[in-house]
Amino acid sequence: MRDVKKRKIAHEAPEHGSDTESTSSHKSVAQQDDPLETQDEATATESRPAPKSFKDLGIIDQLCEACETMGYKAPTPIQAESIPLALQGRDLIGLAETGSGKTAAFALPILQALMENPQSFFGLILAPTRELAFQISKSFESLGSTINVRCAVIVGGMDMVSQSIALGKKPHIIVATPGRLLDHLENTKGFSLRTLKYLVMDEADRLLDMDFGPLLDKILKVLPRERRTFLFSATMSSKVESLQRASLSNPLRVSVSSNKYQTVSTLLQSYLFLPHKHKDIYLVYLLNEFVGQSTIIFTRTVHETQRISFLLRSLGFGAIPLHGQLSQSARLGALGKFRSRSRDILVATDVAARGLDIPSVDVVLNFDLPTDSKTYVHRVGRTARAGKSGVAISFVTQYDVEIWLRIEGALGKKLKEYELEKDEVMVLAERVGEAQRQAIMEMKNFDEKRGTKAKKFGKGKRSRDEMDQEEG
């Protein structure tokens, strides 16, 4: 029985209870639901000074210069704990929140190993969404710019032939969503990962939440056993434990999260208790309050995302939608416009809650409450990043009280109600009503186009391409 050894940093609360890994034979993720057994723990008992630079971690000068160029001044906690172990050739489980610097934590050791032993198909990174895959590839290319690292992004919604050509050029690093990667492994002549040295499963909890388990099983079966594997996740669910046991060899666990529902101190959180029928009016009022600030509005459905985008545009706001049913080019275009601030309002489903590189968000508005506390934390975590301040306001209607109380319970505190003059809000009622009628007209056209597309492609099981996009 191989043990998973835990490594903790000084500010992490000690855990009681433990878990283990199965024997070396490959088992499917679905077969790994056994009760967790006792394991040994390797804890950092001595107080060690925090590393001041990437060079202190063992990163070579060439890559340190790339870090400096990218603005990485000092290692984050997950980088400080993970990189030295990865450089020792250990399999790793990294538990850390979005925005903690996970990508560099696995990219730097892989690039350093690549420099020592250059070869094609050296590393494979699996990601749950297309946007995250492109983002990871960009990080690899930037960090590896001085060594001319070649990356290929293999995701659904893009042309298979052009991707086959890219694979034929034998890139060093492949960043992929599971569905499209498996398509190429099964159908692209001459493509194989038999020589792969590194496998990374990023946002592993989301990979499994999106039903990629069976696809991961098939991918793992064709990868060489003699490889290093890194698994990064925000949470350690039973499904992630199963994936860990199926894919990692004697791993060390690094955790920098002491409370999975913790939010940063620079985030000002509050709520608005309001009638459901007046949500649009309150939304417009708040956007006028925060005019000029970078804002993400979270909704629960694709329909609401589009409707609110139409509503706000008719009122003169620079709003742009982001959801899983947009084409890949439209999604990347929306993110590009929001990052460049040519549009300062992003209306999104939870496709934008985690994993996307949006460096500066001032305000998060939960127009629709999420159904669970974990998603709430990931949503509001889009703002107040890297030491900056941020605001998060949640709309709580008469139908949302129970959900909101659960969220507050998970946070361990009561949040303040956002103060405003309701009479001032309702002054906007007539103007917003006109915009609502305009949005209804535009939604009819939008729904007709969606219906035509659905009929064209027919119904049935979800394709791998559809699984490669977050539904929303």
Swiss-Prot record:
GO terms for cellular component: nucleus. Keywords: ATP-binding, Helicase, Hydrolase, Nucleotide-binding, Nucleus, Ribosome biogenesis, RNA-binding, rRNA processing. It is found in: Nucleus. A motif (DEAD box) lies at residues 202-205. A motif (Q motif) lies at residues 52-80. One of its GO terms (molecular function) is RNA binding. Its EC number is 3.6.4.13. Residues 1-52, 444-472 are annotated as: Disordered. It catalyses: ATP + H2O = ADP + phosphate + H(+). Residues 282-426 form the Helicase C-terminal domain. Residues 10-19 have a biased composition (Basic and acidic residues). Residues 20-31 have a biased composition (Polar residues). Residues 452-462 have a biased composition (Basic residues). One of its GO terms (biological process) is rRNA processing. Interacts with the SSU processome. The Q motif is unique to and characteristic of the DEAD box family of RNA helicases and controls ATP binding and hydrolysis. ATP-dependent rRNA helicase required for pre-ribosomal RNA processing. Involved in the maturation of the 35S-pre-rRNA and to its cleavage to mature 18S rRNA. Belongs to the DEAD box helicase family. DDX47/RRP3 subfamily. This is ATP-dependent rRNA helicase rrp3.
